[in-house]
Amino acid sequence: VKEANPLKAWLEFNNYQSPVVGAEQGFITLAHQNLLGFGDTLSLQYGRSAGVNPMLNFKYEIPVGPRDTTVALQYRRFDFGVEESPFDSLDIKNKAQIFGLSVRHPVIRKADQELAFSLTGEHARNESTLGGNPFELITGAPNGRFRVTSLRFGQEYAQRSAEQVISLLSRFSVGVGAMGATANGDPNLPDARFFSWLGEAQWIRQLPLWRTQLVSRGVVQLSNDHLFPLEQIAVGGRYSVRGYREFTLIRDNAAMLSIEARVPVYTTKAGVDSVFLAPFFDMGHGWQTTAQTPGSLPKTLVSVCAGVIWNFWRGSHFELYYGKQLKRYDTDRNNLQDHGIH
């Protein structure tokens, strides 16, 4: 039996970034699934766009004990400058860093189902400048800086069969006043002391008609306080509501639903479906916790249309989606995303 190569590498290019910082982005990811020989994994991702450099994501995970418990260290960094007119001449820069430590333990682990719990501690730092000087780009961030320290309790459940996959994710987050976390007493300003809940459900079902695969996903986030952007949720873009530009809405709370049918239209000689037509319906609604917050008006985004998915050589993947806005969100920009293309 030939042992699988533990070293993996892959490239990715898409336009899933905000046009404000350059929509088109590229990534390279390197991963080793048995770095020191005891099942530990290391992954490193580097990416950039016209205005973002670098996007870094480093994660090292080690198994602990005989019951598949894992401990992970993670570091993420996201530096960007505004590239879209008319603000590109202002030299607006932002740097965000997130440090994380997590423990994950599966209490049920079978071939057809899994239930796991996780506990994560994170510390985030963000700073903004205008022309090289500290600048309050985000209201409530004195001298352009804010810090958020949070504890997160996660629950994951997955059930698999030959016909379907059901996965549920729940995460409670608490912002604590530690490690210099930014506190604002005004309820209309973001606060690092908060409580929020994020829930996600996904259902993938194999239908008998034309071997169609139905993919549905729902996401909800609720918060008791106005949040800093690193804790908020985005509505609009490839993975929320297609047909709108990425980060059309950034809100404390949101509810999103996506339903997509993947119909095979080309099968290889080996009998593998490789090209799919994917009609979809997306909807998202976002709102702020406090009504007086700037940009607080609730907004609903709705779109329909279709995409093409092509799985080709050795796991390579290509997809192109066009989304038609059913609720118009006016923009005078001329990016591909503004024309519904992802």
Predicted regions and their residues:
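Transmembrane beta-barrel strands of outer-membrane/channel proteins
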Residues: 11-15, 28, 42-48, 73-79, ...
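C-terminal outer-membrane beta-barrel translocator/porin domains of Gram-negative envelope proteins
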Residues: 19, 127-275, 279-283, 287-289, ...
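Outer-membrane beta-barrel initiation region
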Residues: 1-72, 109
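Residue-level signature of outer-membrane beta-barrel architecture
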Residues: 32-34, 62-64, 105-107, 157-159, ...
